[in-house]
A protein has these predicted regions:
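Helix-to-loop junctions at the C-terminal end of transmembrane segments
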Residues: 1-3, 98, 212-235, 325
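C-terminal ends and interior cores of transmembrane alpha-helices
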Residues: 9-35, 240-261
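Symmetry-related core transmembrane helices of the 12-TM Major Facilitator Superfamily/SLC fold
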Residues: 17, 105-124, 336-358
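Pair of pore-lining "gating" transmembrane helices in MFS-fold secondary transporters
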Residues: 46, 157-179
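Glycine-rich segments within core transmembrane alpha-helices of 12-TM secondary carriers
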Residues: 73-98, 306-321
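Juxtamembrane intracellular "pre-TM" segments in multi-pass secondary transporters
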Residues: 132-166, 190, 367-390
Length: 390
């Protein structure tokens, strides 16, 4: 049972939904009992993080195991497109329903969204994974022997490409998530947006992410790779370019904090989402390709390692971003400039991520590596037995 992904996905979704309802409850509780509200919020958001990590990483592992090598990048693209579409739709709809704001309205909406998420997930998982014996494409004779997890982890970490990609995932997700929790307060304080308007702004950002993912998927397909003979279909180009463009969009938010109400904040946020989507889907497609490279059948271990790096960075980035904005606002009187300092630091992280992505060495396809290994073995055997080459 522990080797199956479905129980982990269902459990993660259940924990996530419970955490969402508790977070809304904590928000209402803050007005009456601040200390108890903060304590409940701490546990609620911890549950959200655990739920997202457990379900999201398990989905990636299931994808890596069930989908053939040459289709993994496209499958990961579809999965992430659906995820971002769900985020954009939920943010847009709940943003409209939240106005006029009240604690009771927030709690009802959170409960409804959580129930819908659990029900849709359960329906989607029906007969998706199949029997445990059908998960691996390899037969029982060719399947890799089971090894201790720590040994498999050390083996994967010793691979240069896996190690480089893990560091890239951590830094890029740190930059991505650091603005996640402060963008809405920034819009509310500097631009006087209502809670409903800030939620809709988040939906606009996710719509940009969706567009960026579609654009990257088209460019990395036949259309992009053949257009004028240029390298528009390269995942590395889109990953590095998306990180650089995301840094520029964050510099735009620095300018937004300095200029204030007349700045086109919605267009800037949409562009930030567009560039985030382009780099993230290219990185995800690269991840699914890299999952099959290296020694042995370690797709699950590699994806788990990268998923853990993403989860740790996402939680750490949100915490650091929120703490940095509070610290900056404590020392800087102008809130727009205070938030701008944090956005500027996040732009620097994206520049570092772009450099890391550029240095990741491309790996040969596993089938090509196997063919090379087979040819070398055949030559060696012919030499040993003095057989003539065919």
């Amino acid at each position: 049972m522990m080797g199956r992904c479905t129980p982990w996905i269902i459990g993660g979704i259940a924990v996530l939904a419970t955490g969402g309802v508790l977070a809304a409850t904590a928000t209402a509780m803050l007005a009456e009992n601040f200390s108890l509200g903060v304590l409940l919020a701490f546990f609620a958001f911890a549950m959200i993080g655990v739920g997202v990590s457990a379900s999201g990483t398990s989905v990636l592992v299931l994808l890596a195991k069930r989908v053939e090598d040459h289709r993994r990048a496209a499958a990961a693209t579809i999965v992430w497109l659906m995820m971002i579409l769900g985020l954009a739709m939920t943010a847009g709809i709940t943003g409209h329903l939240l106005d006029p704001y009240s604690h009771e309205r927030l709690l009802v909406i959170a409960l409804a969204v959580s129930l819908i998420a659990v029900c849709v997930s359960l329906l989607a998982l029906v007969r998706l994974e199949g029997n445990p014996g059908s998960i691996n494409h390899a037969s029982a004779e060719t399947a890799a022997p089971r090894v201790p997890f720590t040994h498999a982890l050390r083996e994967v970490w010793s691979e240069q490409s896996a190690r480089q990609f893990t560091i890239f995932v951590f830094v890029s997700m740190l930059a991505f998530s650091a603005q996640d929790l402060i963008l809405e307060p920034f819009a509310g304080i500097v631009f006087q947006f209502t809670p409903g308007e800030t939620t809709k702004l988040s939906g606009l950002q996710h719509a940009g992410v969706l567009c960026g993912m579609v654009l990257c998927a088209l460019a990395c397909g036949r259309f992009g790779s053949r257009w004028m003979g240029l390298q528009f279909g390269s995942l590395r180009v889109w990953t590095v370019g998306g990180c650089l463009a995301s840094a520029l969009a964050l510099i735009g938010l620095v300018a937004a904090g300095m200029i204030g109400g007349s700045y086109p904040i919605r267009a800037n946020v949409f562009l930030l989402g567009l560039f985030n989507g382009a780099f993230s889907i290219a990185a995800i497609a690269s991840m699914m390709r890299l999952a099959s490279t290296g020694r042995g059948h370690r797709e699950g271990t590699r994806v788990g390692l990268w998923g853990a790096a993403q989860a740790i960075a996402f939680g750490t980035g949100g915490l650091i971003g929120a703490a940095a904005s509070d610290f900056s606002r404590y020392w800087i009187d102008d809130p727009g400039i205070a938030y701008g300092v944090v956005f500027f630091a996040e732009a620097g992280l994206f520049l570092v991520a772009a450099r890391l992505a550029f240095r990741i060495e491309p790996q040969p396809h596993p089938h090509q590596a196997a063919d090379k290994s087979t040819s070398y073995t055949a030559k060696w055997k012919r030499k040993e037995h003095h057989e003539p080459a065919i």
